[in-house]
Design a protein with these regions (language model features):
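Gram-positive cell-envelope targeting signals
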Residues: 1-66
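N-terminal maturation segment of proteins
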Residues: 48-622
């Protein structure tokens, strides 16, 4: 599926009472990233076994291959991996490439990919073969960029194989990160580059009932295996589906399609009319019935879930949680190490905030009545685009960003704002969605927009794309890197807003503490076995009400490890920055550090750290 980078408003009231209308808006857990191949749950292990070309001499061994030939072979290998991945389904292809001809990709039949145990097993088989193919290359003969790709792919393929005994724990549905929640936006933003794209889109709509049926069958099997979701989670998804299809004749996807078709150049009036009529028939005849069927299935399965608490309540739940955290964050830290790290960060942030408030009581009151320089999203983005130039590497001013607003039927299930990753060959054109729901205070959205735009997701994605990386990097998704950077950018936003520095520091530490509390709650519920009462007791000491604790508990049960990429990803980047600053001393230049992190692109943090040590050595030796 398309790559939706999403973000929750994390500005949580910390130890202080707020007005009632401000209390609940901070607690809705939203997904991290739906990666570019989310339709089939995973990365770098779809269809197609790679055969490595070895030249004309069939007796060549790795040692006999020249450096040049090895590099050429590796380039062909990763190019084939990229092509296989993006052609796995039509949504992935449409969201990844505007122009398919340079990759010799022919028009393919409409496809949503596949789901279910058999599809996952096939994916593991491909992972195993790709890993074997990867390891045939003589590492020392690769270029530095190829070595980086090799290291990332090898690590991720091995991680994929670790899921072989955990496939039944996979969850395609989710209140915010589930396919049923993401699909409307993915369809709405499906790119109509050509008339063929319109035709493919309409064919995709017909495939949704069968696709959802496979998910329903998967959920039925989970029910039989004692792994079905909690009633609370099921009901939330049911309510979400009902809201989306509540106005079938005036559905969001009908309105969006009509608008796009009317703007599409080159169609006759008859073609426009025909397309509009066909789309309406298919939305009402295929999409809405698919959501109705999913709703009916979930309703029938309610009550069959045997575990109302976190993942550790299942036989292999703790192991699956460890796997989720590792794959989502890109961090090699154990759960115990992460838990200890969170305790330390909460203590440090609390101590720092207490000192600021004690030394300067007015700072606290000022922080409670912040007025940002802009509350209009477009004006905020324009301001941030200019403001980042001091501390962040230069990016072309030709980058565009279209600000759109979430349809009312989707407001309850989507975050305050989110960024849509553009095609790799069309990265200059970006889209950010703003949720106009009454529960979100858009006057306080400044740092959220910093997370999504500059210096956050939009800037990070466009800067990396501007370095002309290998296309295969676009299908490698490390949530911890992208959301860690987004959180880093959000915190930086306090300083870009022109606030008093002490106020900015207080707000920054408050957000860090809040994120750490969410991550602690996640570990507590899903790994340590906290029930609601234990979580409530823990959060109460930080000023959370019972109602707020209930919302957090339900969120952690519904979507385990969702907060970890934001929190742990940020902490990893902050530690890298601290390490670089300490080692370089007076030679540390913030803009150069940012350039290093952005240029290396999404990667596991141990790989980034290894490259950073070399970068530091290079700076010192100059």
């Amino acid at each position: 599926m398309g790559n939706i980078v999403k973000k929750e408003d994390y500005r949580y009231p910390y130890r202080q009472k707020r007005e009632k209308e401000n209390k609940t808006k901070h607690f809705k857990v939203l997904c991290t990233i739906v990666c570019v191949i989310a339709l089939v749950s995973g990365i770098l292990y779809q269809k197609g076994i790679i055969v490595i070309p070895t030249g004309n001499n069939k007796t060549d061994t790795r040692e006999e291959r020249s450096t040049e030939d090895t590099q050429e072979d590796f380039s062909r290998f990763i190019q084939q991996v990229f092509v296989d991945e993006v052609t796995d389904n039509s949504i992935t292809l449409n969201y990844t490439l505007k122009n398919k001809s340079p990759y010799e990709i022919e028009e393919t039949e409409a496809s949503l990919g596949d789901v279910g145990i058999d599809a996952m097993r096939e994916s593991l088989f491909v992972s195993e073969n790709r890993l074997a193919s990867l390891e045939t290359f003589e590492y020392k003969k690769l270029t530095d960029e190829q070595k980086l790709i090799y290291d990332i792919m090898k690590k991720m393929l091995k991680q994929n194989l670790e899921s072989s005994e955990l496939l039944e724990y996979t969850e395609y549905l989710g209140v915010t990160s589930g396919i049923q929640a993401q699909l409307p936006i993915l369809l709405a933003e499906y790119n109509f580059y050509s008339k063929e794209d319109i035709d493919t889109y309409l064919e995709l709509l017909k495939l949704i009932p069968d696709y959802f049926m496979k998910i329903e069958n998967f959920e039925r099997q989970k029910s039989k295996d004692g792994l079905f979701m909690s009633d609370t989670t099921a009901q939330a998804i049911i309510d979400q589906c009902k809201e989306f299809i509540s106005h079938s004749s005036d559905n969001y996807l009908i309105k969006v399609f009509d608008n796009k078709i009317n703007k599409f150049k080159g169609l006759s009036e008859e073609e426009v009319s025909s397309y509009i009529d066909t789309n309406k028939k298919e939305i009402t005849g295929y999409v809405i019935p698919a959501y109705e069927s999913l709703t009916d299935t979930l309703t029938s399965l309610k009550g069959t879930g045997v575990n109302p608490n976190g993942l550790c309540g299942y036989k292999k739940g703790k192991k699956y949680y460890e796997y989720l955290v590792k794959t989502k964050t890109g961090s090699d830290h154990s759960i115990k190490e992460i838990n200890d790290m969170l305790d330390k960060k909460i203590k440090q942030a609390s101590k720092y905030m207490s000192k600021i408030i004690t030394d300067s009581p007015d700072i606290y009151y000022e922080s409670q009545n912040i007025k940002y320089p802009y509350d209009d999203p477009k004006e905020t983005i324009n301001h941030l685009q200019k403001a980042v130039k001091k501390d962040f590497p230069e990016l072309s001013d030709n980058i565009s960003c279209d600000v759109k607003y979430v349809d009312k039927s989707l407001q309850d299930s989507l975050s305050p704002a989110f960024y849509l990753t553009p095609a790799v060959d069309n990265y200059e054109n970006n889209v950010i969605y703003i949720n106009n729901s009454a529960k979100y205070d858009l006057s306080k959205i400044f740092t959220t927009i910093a997370h999504e735009s500059y210096p956050g997701h939009l800037y990070q994605n466009c800067y990396f794309a501007s370095t002309n990386p290998s296309p295969v990097r676009s299908i490698i998704n490390i949530d911890g890197y992208t959301e860690g950077w987004g959180t880093y950018a959000e915190l930086y936003g306090y300083y870009l807003a022109g606030l008093d520095r002490k106020v900015a520091e207080l707000l920054e530490k408050n957000t860090i503490a809040t994120l750490c509390l969410y991550a602690k709650s996640d570990i507590g519920v899903n790994y340590l076995g906290w029930d609601y009462k234990k979580l409530e007791k823990y959060l109460n000491q930080y000023g959370f009400s019972a109602a707020q604790s209930r919302i957090i508990f339900d969120s952690m049960v519904a979507e385990p490890a969702s907060y970890m990429p934001y929190t742990l990803g940020y902490l990893e980047i902050a530690d890298l920055k601290k390490d670089a600053s300490e080692k370089l001393g007076s030679d540390f230049i913030l803009k150069d550090f940012h350039k290093f992190i952005l240029s290396i692109g999404p990667a596991p943090f141990d790989i980034i750290e290894e490259r950073m040590d070399k970068w530091i050595d290079g700076v010192i030796s100059k």
